[in-house]
Amino acid sequence: MEGLARVFLIGGASKAVRYDEQTTIERVIHVVARGIGISQVAVAHFALRLVTGPSPQTAGSGDSLWLHPMLRITQLPHIYARHLPIGVCDEIKLEMRMRFMPQSVYELQATDSSAFVYLHEQVVDEFFSHVAWRSSVEVALEVAALKVCRDFAEHQHNKGADHHLEDLDIEACIQSLIPNVLHNPGFKHSHLKKTFTAYIKKFSATSPNESIIRSLALLLEVVKFDVELFKASLGAGWTKPVELVVGPHTGLSYRLNERCDSSRLLELRTIAEITIRKMENGSEKTLMQLNLSGAAKPVLITLSTEELSQSLAHLLDGYQMLYNQRDSVFKLKGIERCETLTMHEATIRPKTPNNIDSNIRLRRELITLKELIGGGQFGNVYKAVYHDLEKDERIAVAVKVCKTDAEPADTQLILQESSLMRNFRHSNIIQLIGVCVDQPMWLVLELAPKGELREYLQQEKDWLPLRILTLFCSQICDSLVYLHSTRFVHRDIAARNILVCSPQCVKLADFGLSRALDYDAVYTASRGKLPIKWLAPESVNYRQFSMASDVWMFGVCMWEIFSLGVKPWAGVTNSDVIMHIEQGSRPPCPEKCPTALYNFIRSKMWAIEPHKRPTVDQIYAIIEDVRQQIIQNIPPEQIIVGKPMTAAGVIVAEMSSLPGLTLYRTMEDQKRQAEEDAKWLEQEDDEDEDDQDIDQIPSTSHSSVENIRTSNGYLHHTPTSTRSLRFEDKTSRGLRRSVDGVCDAVTKLQNSFNNLTHNDDFLHSVKEVTSQLREMLIVASGMRDRVTTTTQRTDVDMTKTLIANDMKQMSRVMGKLQVNGHQATYNTLRRDVVRICGELAVNCTTLQLQLTQPPLENEFSSLLSNC
């Protein structure tokens, strides 16, 4: 999204600034300041406030809407919607003012004359707009005369015209600058004109700099431009009303009223963190908390409205940034705050899993903790800075600090989490950077600047579109596809354990409860607290966890996302949740969730029986299909959710678990079938000389199996059995060959790929896959008429949709590869391509079976007769 923002300057001039989705208020200030000749040194004194009317003069209450420097321009219409009148032009209007005053205006004159002149014009404008009518007539006339002389001299210099001050219309000058003075009953009109004329003659020879200094000296006592006043109450609650005074000389002080002396509350440079929150539901009052460097307790201040709180917080934050030369400490909802140093997100290449001591162990002295950002069962989480000596750069990271009094079992869980995370490589899973193994143990993780997803949803709920919510679901599901393909279950999938790295990227985190699955595909927990309201029934009742229980939890997580951060089962106790579930109750459909998608979550993902739930790769295909429909602007009520497809493969059974008689009968049937197939092959070879390659296809009992890796494990792609070949014609055999070609190309890509694979070789392998896929689709397009039943047609259409989604996804990833130069991200994207190719092979095999499915009535009859 791009647009133009109109920035008004003092005196009525304005600048148009082009912005995009990443343009911040801070960036606009820098651009405008540079455009009017203000140096980088003085930029920190300036701020922007939102103009809520056609111009600053008609803005009304907009003077209190000061904008956080890290706020994005595109967020303004959403955050301040109730302040912007309906029907106003879409162009965003801002006003730039100097808000953070210097210790000495004369020092500012020496360092940046342009900023000094801007401050003077601002103070004079404030005087004529709001103060002149209640000040002494002599001061008003003198300030007005100084301004007229300066403006006249500037006009003479710019135009080169030969005019004289005596030619000025004195009454018009007074009327334009201080009209209220004309109606002062204490002065006669003729006396006003005479006094004003005398001042003009007196200052006619004064230089512009001297004129500005004299004006500021006069106005300092009248306008009080170096302080701001706020009505507030110290502490929590409106119990001790005072007047707060904020300025470079007063710091943050308070006084009972205007006649009392002020008492200093704190120094502005000591402010370490600013947060504001509503006092209670239904109340306009807000509570501000100021955490101070070196202070044991925070300072609490109650203000009457949220706008007033944000204005005070903005002022205090601006002064501490000016004095400490660091970035914002004001925690405003929805704002990404910067760090002191120039840092970027920690998307550095994870260490190799070999030799944990040397490869992921970090020196504690290279890590500087900055601020507490969260806590959990095993310890607190801090924002920190890690000094990477190899690259000689400082990186913003998150540090999980284990409690010093933690039980050995809890310490073991944290060690296990680090052991798990060092092996995970996925673009939507938080990366482990390293571990400080000495007590207290530290886990150093990739930093997600925007925090937990649940809080982010609550903060940004007014602007988050359905497209973004579905994207979040898709990214989380993609990470689960990867996790399950490595035979791990997460066991704690919830919005609180999803972290937001950017407005369009979320990552799965908190692997403290993750477990590797054994061959039973079920893990039984023996201890620890469990998140009851997110758990599947079998997890609550029997403490059993599997990929199917992860699917249930992901369904609850999706519900949280579409509910914009609402907790599930609100008002229901943990002990009653399982009773509600077993009685058929489920959380209601969120307002933002498409009905068809909610029905899929309710009926499939929240099925009581674990085996009836879809796999995460099937869910991923469904979500991607829904997301594409949303991108195509299909209304939510018209969105369709297809039937989840199951990849066709070999039925795998544990031979030792079969009864002896059944095992013997199975072996005999396979032997007899192999003999019949061999005879039939010989006959077919004689009858059809055009298909010489059929006799090379092995029987079912001797076929070699090609393993194609998919996101859900392996697809055992076996060459088509001779039983199926009985029903093949030339077209069917052509489709089989083309599908085999796709599978062979994918297998070759998977077997040859690693992080060191040359890019040309990788691209050649991918082109081979797409070439074979194109051939297969050409053959398949001519076979749809063979499908006779509606159900079969629906299945074929769904599989084609899955293939199309895979191709779109691969196209997007390949596009990212062309513009991405970071090695770690580059290899992650290439692995994504390999994974998508595996999914393509699965779906192509499924399509082949659907288009060439032989009649099954006779086989069913034979099977039933053997029962």
Swiss-Prot record:
SMART domains in the record: B41, TyrKc
Cross-referenced InterPro entries: Band_41_domain, FAK1-like_FERM_C, FAK1/PYK2_FERM_C, FERM/acyl-CoA-bd_prot_sf, FERM_2, FERM_domain, Focal_adhe_kin_target_dom_sf, Focal_adhesion_kin_target_dom
Domain Protein kinase: 367-631
Biased composition (Acidic residues): 683-694
Presence of keyword Acetylation: no
Region of interest (Disordered), residue spans: 674-729
GO CC field: cytoskeleton; focal adhesion; plasma membrane
Protein's name in the database: Inactive tyrosine-protein kinase kin-32
Protein source organism: Caenorhabditis elegans
